[in-house]
Amino acid sequence: MTYLNKQQGGIFKNPLVVSLFAILCCALWGSATPFIKMGYKLMFPDGGPDVQSTILFAGIRFALAGFITIVIYSIARKKWLYPKAENLGKIGIVAVFQTIIQYFFFYLGLALTSGAKGTILSGSSSFFAILISSLFFKQEKLTVKKVVACVIGFAGIVAVNISGLEYTMNWGDAFVIFAAISLGISSVLIKIFAKNEDPVVISGYQFMIGGTVMVVVGFAFGGRVDLSDIGGVGVLLYLSLLSAVAYALWGVLLKYNPVSKVTIFSFMTPVFGVLLTALMLPEESNVEIISLIISLVLVCLGVFLLNFTGFPQKEKTEPQPVLDNGNTPDEGDCDSTVIESGVISNSSK
């Protein structure tokens, strides 16, 4: 039994705790949008990065995130943590889907499509996670309530980006959708593999594997990142830290809860991204307040619908039978009450 199983399993099953931590994860991921833009400005002052430099930048971020995750968790456990030998291949598979494929196609797609469309399409990962979990891995049932909740949540993403939406389809859109599918698959895989491995260990090592691969590929194809700017390095460290915290926590939530109950909160990530970008980089945001409010209402409604199980029913008080002496079973001077086949009788020693 792992440390999390013994110490925190019950906590991470509490609906309120799940909601708060899931929202925290989404807020952290949402903050990545303005910080990535800030990092690009500081580390690529002559213009935006090319594709290979973007891959290198992301690879450094995630390799460092994995290292931070394992170091912090090892200090907490008072020993260096390694994955079980039989789980190395599984962690490699998660790295392929969650880090390498997802972020390669996501960043490539953003270079070929608008920011608004990229945000909307990336939000579809919740759809794919629930569909894959229900239809392919049979981890849970696909119900009408889940579909409706996803549609409402997705409508919230559309609402916050409606001014920048273009009704066309190109390769950039397809790449972002492919990245969303890859992220959905990784969520389901983490749920499966976490049965035999600590989800924090999975998160840390898959980041190191995936990030290292991206660094090698980006550098091999001519990618360059200027690490001489202190501000840029600070942004890179923050991005690594938020990935370490958010993905590790997300993995724990997936371990102890149905995929749909957790991934539905992913619809909040684009909303946080737009909100924080408007606050931190107002020159790059043209979102109207009314659109943001409508978006938040729709996303929260979708989350509530999926997690709402109905109002608690008031227990009915059954009338207690009366004994021969006129007392109820908990009264009288009988030593014990024996109830068999609906017949109540007194039995004395």
Task: Walk through the language-model features, giving the residues of each.
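C-terminal-most transmembrane helix of multi-pass membrane proteins
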Residues: 2-12, 62, 162, 267-349
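Membrane-interface helix-cap regions at the ends of transmembrane helices
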Residues: 2-5, 38, 42, 65-83, ...
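Juxtamembrane helix-entry segments on the extracytoplasmic side of multipass membrane proteins
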Residues: 14-19, 50-55, 83-89, 162-182, ...
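Helix-helix packing/entry segments at the starts of transmembrane helices
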Residues: 24, 60, 99, 103, ...
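Juxtamembrane helix-loop-helix junctions in multi-pass membrane proteins
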Residues: 27-65, 185-209, 257-259
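Hydrophobic/small/kink-forming positions within alpha-helical transmembrane segments
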Residues: 27-30, 34, 63, 95-100, ...
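Specific transmembrane alpha-helical segments of multi-pass solute transporters/efflux pumps
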Residues: 74-116, 159-161, 240-257
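Loop-to-transmembrane alpha-helix entry segments
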Residues: 119-122, 138-159, 169-173, 230, ...
